[in-house]
């Protein structure tokens, strides 16, 4: 079993220099064209309310494009320049798209209740919040989105001063209609992402954008990047050394991409630029394929256990991580040994194979520690590595 575990955790010692600069993986926003919708028709309050009411019905695409045009038209340019200049400064290519004729008044209006809350004083905030909420469907499926609306939307909307969003229609049929027109790579999706980036550029409203959508829009891969950076800081470890200690053979390809992405994000000036890089992958059709994130649950589990030793409560996030119970115990022990290894001074210490051998021995002993709090099922036995290495 020890040899199988060592084989699984191969590390990245064979990956040097130029191999990390994978030419087949492009993360830069310059590969993305962001549409800026505009309307030749004056967008009065009644037209905006009609568009809001039709989101989630057969007129969803037209309604959302008109709402994008309204937000762009109403956004006040910052000191950094116009809306277009801000997005171009982040490296995106822009194109202007006419929304065409106004929405048909005969379309169904599943979000009429939300539309009725709109007045002149709150129209921009409500419409922007609605776009942010709809954008979550680029990541969540209908069931997860319904759960999000039920459990989180009211609290987040109220905390960000857009309590009207509690009237958003979270019926699964309505969510399915919205999700059908918002997919990575589609023009409407890119237009909404452009609006998110504009909001992130303004310190006065950046917190709202982050709270309602941006942190979720960055994708699982960026969650792991954040955990990795936090763990490296906590340990005082060189990122390359820590990555070698964590990396399993099955995730080497994904790790290459994550290493490169971390480098680019670290060099990006300002929060909007950092999210611009992150989102540039979400805006392409190949985003979910680009990271082998399903294989990275084990690494995430170890990182959370490391960070929990410095920030109590981090490990509560492990509830949603699907790994087997034996690996949960192993992850805690690996985290403990990594803390001892680095001890805040970045020492290289023993190699990954020896560290994992010691962790495995300790995790099987009687002094492993408290019982697991989670009641989750073990991994699917068909997932690579689990049944052979950890059972």
From Swiss-Prot:
Alphabetically ordered keywords of this record: Capsid protein, Helical capsid protein, Host cytoplasm, Phosphoprotein, Ribonucleoprotein, RNA-binding, Viral nucleoprotein, Virion
Subcellular compartments: Virion; Host cytoplasm
GO cellular component terms, A-Z: helical viral capsid; host cell cytoplasm; ribonucleoprotein complex; viral nucleocapsid
InterPro entries: Rhabdo_ncap_2
Predominant place of localization: virion
Alphabetical list of Pfam families matching this protein: Rhabdo_ncap_2
Ranges of biased composition (kind: Acidic residues): 368-391
Ranges where the record places region Disordered: 346-391
Family affiliation: Belongs to the novirhabdovirus nucleocapsid protein family.
Assembly with partners or alone: Homomultimerizes to form the nucleocapsid. Binds to viral genomic RNA.
Role according to the record: Encapsidates the genome, protecting it from nucleases. If expressed without protein P it binds non-specifically RNA and therefore can bind it's own mRNA. Interaction with protein P abolishes any non-specific RNA binding, and prevents phosphorylation. The soluble N-P complex encapsidates specifically the genomic RNA, with protein N protecting the genome like a pearl necklace. The encapsidated genomic RNA is termed the nucleocapsid (NC) and serves as template for viral transcription and replication. Protein N binds protein P in the NC through a different interaction, and can be phosphorylated.
Name the UniProt record assigns to this protein: Nucleoprotein
């Amino acid at each position: 079993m020890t040899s199988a575990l060592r084989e699984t955790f191969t590390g990245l010692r064979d990956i040097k220099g130029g191999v990390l600069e994978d030419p087949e993986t492009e993360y830069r926003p310059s590969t993305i064209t962001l549409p800026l919708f505009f309307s030749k028709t004056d967008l009065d309050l009644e037209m905006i309310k009609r568009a809001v009411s039709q989101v989630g019905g057969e007129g969803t695409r037209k309604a959302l494009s008109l709402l994008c045009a309204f937000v762009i038209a109403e956004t006040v340019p910052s000191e950094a320049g116009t809306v277009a200049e801000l997005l171009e400064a982040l490296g995106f290519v822009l194109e202007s798209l006419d929304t065409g004729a106004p929405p048909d008044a005969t379309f169904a209006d599943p979000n009429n209740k939300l539309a009725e809350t709109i007045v002149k004083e709150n129209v921009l905030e409500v419409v922007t919040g609605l776009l942010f909420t709809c954008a979550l469907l680029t990541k969540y499926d209908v069931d997860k989105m319904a759960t999000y609306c039920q459990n989180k939307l009211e609290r987040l909307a109220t905390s960000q001063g857009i309590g009207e969003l509690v009237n958003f229609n979270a019926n699964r049929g309505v969510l399915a209609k919205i999700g059908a027109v918002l997919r990575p790579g589609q023009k409407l999706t890119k237009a909404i992402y452009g609006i998110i980036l504009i909001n992130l550029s303004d310190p006065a409203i950046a917190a709202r954008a982050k709270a309602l959508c941006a942190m979720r829009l960055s994708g699982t891969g960026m969650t792991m990047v954040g955990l990795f950076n936090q763990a490296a800081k906590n340990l005082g470890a060189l990122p390359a050394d820590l990555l070698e200690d964590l990396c399993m053979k099955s995730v080497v390809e994904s790790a290459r991409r994550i290493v490169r992405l971390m480098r680019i994000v670290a060099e990006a000036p300002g929060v909007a630029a950092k999210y611009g890089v992150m989102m540039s992958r979400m805006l392409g059709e190949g985003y979910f394929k680009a990271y082998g994130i399903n294989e990275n649950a084990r690494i995430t589990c170890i990182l959370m256990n490391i960070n929990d030793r410095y920030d109590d409560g981090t490990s509560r996030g492990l509830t949603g991580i699907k790994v087997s119970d034996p690996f949960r115990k192993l992850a805690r022990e690996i985290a403990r040994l990594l803390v001892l290894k680095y001890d805040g001074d970045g020492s290289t210490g023993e190699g990954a194979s020896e560290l994992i051998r010691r962790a495995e021995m300790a995790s099987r002993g009687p002094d492993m520690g408290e019982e697991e709090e989670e009641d989750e099922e073990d991994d699917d036995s068909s997932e690579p590595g689990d049944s052979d290495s950890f059972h």
